Amino acid sequence: MTTDTTGRTGNPAAAASPERFRYGFLKGNPQLTKNGELKHLLSIEGLPRSIVNHILDTAEQFVSVTDREVKKVPLLRGKSVFNLFFENSTRTRTTFEIAATRLSADVLNLNINASSTSKGESLLDTINNLSAMHADLFVVRHASSGAPYLIAEHCAPHVHVINAGDGRHAHPTQGLLDMYTIRHYKRDFTKLRVAIVGDILHSRVARSDIHALTTLGVPEVRAIGPRTLLPGGLEQMGVKVFHNLDEGLKGVDVIIMLRLQNERMSGALLPSAQEYFKTWGLTPERLALAAPDAIVMHPGPMNRGVEIDSQVADGPQSVILNQVTFGIAVRMAVMGIVAGNND
């Protein structure tokens, strides 16, 4: 038995088989206070629809802030936000930093490679030391599923935690910004058919999107991909599974494309990228199978010529760059809700 960076023995992701959709460390709902208010954002799973809608409604208000000449509000003035990214990130880290700055927070980006964790310090010891510096909010991305839960469980009572992606488990702010994007273009969730396409097995975004879509009442969620890249447990959540892209895309209103997460694959699950594109790539011809006003989304990073054709990515039905723009407002909303009150 080994000791990992969290300070615990064993594998931090061992609570769940990678083939299953749900994770075993979700006990109760540690992200809510006794009064049902949001203290941490760790997962969309288990969040009441009212809280999800409250976040989306609050984000709507912050969209106008991003369009102003002075793009700041004083909601987190005097608060310290620590961005702790133990995995690489461009969009998520940058938009969290922009969001915190626009809320007037003091922002610190921890250089993980130069931190004491690279010298063997456990994750919890790192968190305890940063808490002693009077941190108010930790934004955490970690390769181990459940790491943000561990931090939320052991951090000081006044500290809030936002999960910016943990292993294969969850990426709740991406899920929320995806829901905001869908609501912006489609308005009524209860009349939609949404397809998620690609490497769903390794995708924390897919898990968060599926939980969010079902919470918001989407009547038909489709998971489309090779058998080797689809987790078990999807049908039990009411998700329709397709192993043929053309069949799965027929009549859908929203298409969410996912990249191949080769860094999380332990074996040869697929042929070459070229062969993958022939079978699973979203081309203009395949997009034509969807509803005429369907929108195309992608959480990024995007691999052109692998899961999506450039004509689609840059075409009139693509809202991919708008997702990034909306992500700032959504992350402002999340940080404002969890840490904006006087603790």
Swiss-Prot record:
<dbReference type="InterPro" id="IPR036901">
    <property type="entry name" value="Asp/Orn_carbamoylTrfase_sf"/>
</dbReference>
<comment type="pathway">
    <text>Pyrimidine metabolism; UMP biosynthesis via de novo pathway; (S)-dihydroorotate from bicarbonate: step 2/3.</text>
</comment>
<dbReference type="InterPro" id="IPR002082">
    <property type="entry name" value="Asp_carbamoyltransf"/>
</dbReference>
<feature type="binding site">
    <location>
        <position position="204"/>
    </location>
    <ligand>
        <name>L-aspartate</name>
    </ligand>
</feature>
<feature type="binding site">
    <location>
        <position position="171"/>
    </location>
    <ligand>
        <name>carbamoyl phosphate</name>
    </ligand>
</feature>
<feature type="binding site">
    <location>
        <position position="119"/>
    </location>
    <ligand>
        <name>L-aspartate</name>
    </ligand>
</feature>
<feature type="binding site">
    <location>
        <position position="92"/>
    </location>
    <ligand>
        <name>carbamoyl phosphate</name>
    </ligand>
</feature>
<dbReference type="GO" id="GO:0005829">
    <property type="term" value="C:cytosol"/>
</dbReference>
<feature type="binding site">
    <location>
        <position position="301"/>
    </location>
    <ligand>
        <name>carbamoyl phosphate</name>
    </ligand>
</feature>
<comment type="subunit">
    <text>Heterododecamer (2C3:3R2) of six catalytic PyrB chains organized as two trimers (C3), and six regulatory PyrI chains organized as three dimers (R2).</text>
</comment>
<keyword id="KW-0808">Transferase</keyword>
<keyword id="KW-0665">Pyrimidine biosynthesis</keyword>
<dbReference type="InterPro" id="IPR006131">
    <property type="entry name" value="Asp_carbamoyltransf_Asp/Orn-bd"/>
</dbReference>
<feature type="binding site">
    <location>
        <position position="91"/>
    </location>
    <ligand>
        <name>carbamoyl phosphate</name>
    </ligand>
</feature>
<protein>
    <recommendedName>
        <fullName>Aspartate carbamoyltransferase catalytic subunit</fullName>
        <ecNumber>2.1.3.2</ecNumber>
    </recommendedName>
</protein>
<dbReference type="GO" id="GO:0006520">
    <property type="term" value="P:amino acid metabolic process"/>
</dbReference>
<comment type="similarity">
    <text>Belongs to the aspartate/ornithine carbamoyltransferase superfamily. ATCase family.</text>
</comment>
<dbReference type="GO" id="GO:0006207">
    <property type="term" value="P:'de novo' pyrimidine nucleobase biosynthetic process"/>
</dbReference>
<dbReference type="Pfam" id="PF02729">
    <property type="entry name" value="OTCace_N"/>
</dbReference>
<dbReference type="InterPro" id="IPR006132">
    <property type="entry name" value="Asp/Orn_carbamoyltranf_P-bd"/>
</dbReference>
<dbReference type="GO" id="GO:0044205">
    <property type="term" value="P:'de novo' UMP biosynthetic process"/>
</dbReference>
<feature type="binding site">
    <location>
        <position position="174"/>
    </location>
    <ligand>
        <name>carbamoyl phosphate</name>
    </ligand>
</feature>
<comment type="function">
    <text>Catalyzes the condensation of carbamoyl phosphate and aspartate to form carbamoyl aspartate and inorganic phosphate, the committed step in the de novo pyrimidine nucleotide biosynthesis pathway.</text>
</comment>
<feature type="binding site">
    <location>
        <position position="259"/>
    </location>
    <ligand>
        <name>L-aspartate</name>
    </ligand>
</feature>
<feature type="binding site">
    <location>
        <position position="141"/>
    </location>
    <ligand>
        <name>carbamoyl phosphate</name>
    </ligand>
</feature>
<dbReference type="InterPro" id="IPR006130">
    <property type="entry name" value="Asp/Orn_carbamoylTrfase"/>
</dbReference>
<dbReference type="GO" id="GO:0016597">
    <property type="term" value="F:amino acid binding"/>
</dbReference>
<dbReference type="Pfam" id="PF00185">
    <property type="entry name" value="OTCace"/>
</dbReference>
<feature type="binding site">
    <location>
        <position position="300"/>
    </location>
    <ligand>
        <name>carbamoyl phosphate</name>
    </ligand>
</feature>
<dbReference type="GO" id="GO:0004070">
    <property type="term" value="F:aspartate carbamoyltransferase activity"/>
</dbReference>
